[in-house]
């Protein structure tokens, strides 16, 4: 997508990618999107770890060392970003979303745009039990989530922390006694039925009016600690339609969002969670035509009429992550739908 001649670009455009860590491929794809809108823009990365992979990879002028977010007051974070002339901020980690959501309005007054959902929906997506109670009647059934396994009519379970991601503490396919034993290791455990099946992610970009601009589907063919290390895009019109309705039925979602879904052996969809942020395999979505970064910038510049309502996404684009290196290519074979 080229930069239209009528596009009015504020100067300077300096985008900060927070919690950069080792997300080099994501940073590079963000740079591509930004440059399509403004070739003169600068994209910085930031992290509280001065020795992170991102700090070693980026030029020193493009990396900022930050304190831990909880150490900043609202005024201090405004002052920090203003001092570095930041015009846009893109969070990349679950644990920081609440902070940026709570400070979004204050930053907006300083002409700093943040790609983040509203605080109440961030809290909803962080709380798995409340998320289930609020979304179990929507277009796609949420996986049953309970504070006790006795309320679940299954023989095997998944045990997780109620709040946050915590993929490294999850217990999968456990019998009831094993599930209860695993739960003792967690702070606030919740229980879900174990549902065997294929898993996919559905990614979208949601504008400030709550409209979802296209649904990009990708199979999660190899997952390590909750992150896709192998993934490939595919299409299914019925699933895309229902997932679009799902996203649009949750007020307050904004920016890049993704849903994790399991397809059961019977072919029904079970919603696992919604992450209102860029994900670890999002470089694949950005490569396949989900230009969230471009659209975030266009919306912030009151150029929403240039954002396509129904983008065309490329099928068969594949991501492989090995030894921290991400490669993206077009698969020679088109992925089949699950039956």
Predicted regions mapped to residue ranges:
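Active-site nucleotide/adenylate-binding loops and adjacent lid/helix of ATP-dependent enzymes
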Residues: 119-197, 208-211, 237-241
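Short glycine-rich, flexible loops that bind phosphorylated cofactors or substrates
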Residues: 97-98, 166, 279
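Cysteine/selenocysteine-centered motifs that mediate thiol-based redox chemistry or coordinate metal-sulfur cofactors
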Residues: 304-339
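ATP-binding N-terminal substructure of ATP-dependent carboxylate-amine bond-forming enzymes
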Residues: 1-115
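Residues at the starts of beta-strands that form the adenosine-phosphate
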Residues: 40-42, 211, 268
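ATP-dependent carboxylate/phosphate-activation module, predominantly the ATP-grasp catalytic core
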Residues: 173, 192-252, 256, 263, ...
